[in-house]
């Protein structure tokens, strides 16, 4: 799962808190929490069994993280979570336009959204242009993720949160 930590090589921003939306088995949140022990992670998933697993992993590894049984849409309605994170990350969760709706409401203005994607990211970003503008995001860069020994075309799309997300999202 080197693709989860590869964004660290490209100038990872100094942040205090991050949320991994749709964490599933803990990717990318668990590898990032291992590599960045000073950052507070929240791992979020809609399935209770996955969250139980995440809590076990967090406890056994002694990570600076919590796991929440929560959908992103519901998290955005909670005042303590809405625009409460410096960074929101996701890997293999949804197309970019939908992912923006899940992640950007959770990111503080001045923070970032990080989407771990495949070779179609440029097309996805073009299709998400309206969503980005509406939700307060702006594409900062697309970072190729080089995985030693693998011929994969993985990319990290960095979205800067430049304005508050309207309350209806």
Language model feature labels by segment:
Residues 36-42, 46-169:
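S-adenosylmethionine
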Residues 25-38:
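Conserved SAM-binding loop of SAM-dependent methyltransferases across substrates and taxa
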Residues 8-9, 33, 104:
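N-terminal cationic-hydrophobic initiation segments that often serve targeting/anchoring roles
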Residues 3-6, 23, 53:
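Hydrophobic side chains within alpha-helical segments
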Residues 14-24:
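Conserved class I S-adenosyl-L-methionine
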């Amino acid at each position: 799962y080197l693709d989860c930590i590869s964004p660290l090589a490209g100038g990872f921003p100094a942040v205090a808190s991050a949320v991994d939306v749709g964490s599933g088995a803990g990717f990318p949140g668990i590898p990032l929490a291992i590599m960045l022990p000073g950052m507070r992670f929240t791992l979020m998933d809609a399935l209770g069994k996955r969250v139980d697993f995440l809590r076990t992993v967090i406890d056994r590894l002694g990570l600076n993280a919590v796991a929440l049984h929560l959908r992103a849409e519901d998290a955005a309605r909670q005042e303590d979570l809405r625009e409460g994170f410096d960074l929101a990350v996701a890997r293999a969760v949804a197309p970019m336009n939908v992912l923006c709706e899940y992640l950007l409401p959770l990111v503080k203005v001045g923070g970032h959204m990080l989407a771990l994607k495949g070779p179609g990211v440029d097309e996805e970003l073009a299709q998400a242009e309206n969503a980005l503008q509406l939700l307060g995001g702006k594409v900062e860069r697309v970072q190729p993720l080089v995985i030693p020994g693998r011929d994969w075309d993985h990319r990290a799309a960095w979205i800067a949160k430049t304005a508050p997300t309207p309350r209806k999202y």
